[in-house]
């Protein structure tokens, strides 16, 4: 059975490119445009990994990360162009396992 990865990324090109790379590596990938859509799916079917963009409309990636972490220990990677130490620490404190 393939490992399942959920991606929440509002930028279509990034979302589709990341999905394509991961699928080519043999993963099952469900990609979502919003954090809310990812949360709805995750609480119905658990993923093996979650990749979250931090800056999304609606429920942002940090909030999604915190909400996921309250209920699940699934590994979470935060994906963002924000690269300050403050952003990194905020992501880890919200429950992220890694920050790219």
Residue ranges and their predicted role:
Residues 1-100:
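N-terminal/domain-start alpha-helical segments
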């Amino acid at each position: 059975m393939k490992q399942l990865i959920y991606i929440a990324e509002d930028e279509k090109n990034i979302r589709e490119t990341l999905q394509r790379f991961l699928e080519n590596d043999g993963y099952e990938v469900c990609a979502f445009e919003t954090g809310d859509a990812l949360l709805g799916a995750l609480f119905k079917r658990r993923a093996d990994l979650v990749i979250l963009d931090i800056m999304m409309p609606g429920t942002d990636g940090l909030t999604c990360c915190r909400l996921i972490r309250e209920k699940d220990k699934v590994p979470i990677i935060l994906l963002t162009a924000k690269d300050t130490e403050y952003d990194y620490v905020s992501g880890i404190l919200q429950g992220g396992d890694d920050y790219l």
